[in-house]
C-alpha cells in the first residue's frame, strides 16, 4: 500500500515497497491505521473507495495482531470491517463473517464510532442509509 504525502489517502501500489521492519506495520494484510486513535466519545469519518471492486474498511484496536498470517489466527475480536471481493458484501471481524445484501453500492462510506455505547456503524455517505453496525466492548484505543 502507498500512503500519500499528506497521509490522507492510500492506494494499492504496483509493487511491494521495501520498507524497514516496524512492529506497528501489518505484515500479512493490506492494512493501514489512521494516525489518530480514540478512547472516548463519538467520531465520524468517511472513506471513498471509488470504483474499486475489492476493498475493506473499518477500525481496529490498538493491540490488533499485526504479524499473524491469517485473520483466523486472532484470539480476540480486534478488527471490525466492511468489505467486498467485488461480488458479495460482508461484515467481518477476526472470527466472524456476515454476508450483507445492501440495496445500494456506495462509492463513499461513512463510519460512525460511539465508543461509550460500543458501536461501530457503517453508512452510505451519499444517502446516509444504514448498512451495518458492530456492537463490541472496545476498552482500548480504536483506530480508523
Feature annotation, model-predicted:
Residues 1-144:
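Beta-rich ligand-recognition domains in immune and ubiquitin systems
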Amino acid at each position: 500500500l502507498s500512503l500519500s504525502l499528506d497521509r490522507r489517502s492510500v492506494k494499492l501500489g504496483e509493487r511491494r515497497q521495501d520498507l524497514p521492519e516496524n512492529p506497528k506495520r501489518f505484515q500479512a494484510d493490506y492494512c493501514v491505521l489512521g494516525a489518530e486513535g480514540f478512547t472516548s466519545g463519538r467520531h465520524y469519518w468517511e472513506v471513498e473507495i471509488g470504483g474499486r471492486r475489492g476493498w475493506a474498511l473499518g477500525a481496529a484496536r490498538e493491540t490488533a495482531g499485526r504479524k499473524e498470517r491469517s485473520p483466523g489466527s486472532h484470539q480476540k475480536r480486534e478488527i471490525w470491517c466492511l468489505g467486498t471481493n467485488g461480488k458479495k458484501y460482508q461484515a467481518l471481524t477476526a472470527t466472524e463473517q456476515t454476508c450483507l445484501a445492501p440495496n445500494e453500492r456506495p462509492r463513499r462510506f461513512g463510519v460512525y464510532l460511539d465508543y461509550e455505547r460500543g458501536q461501530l456503524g457503517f453508512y452510505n455517505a451519499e444517502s446516509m442509509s444504514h448498512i451495518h453496525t458492530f456492537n463490541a466492548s472496545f476498552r482500548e484505543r480504536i483506530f480508523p
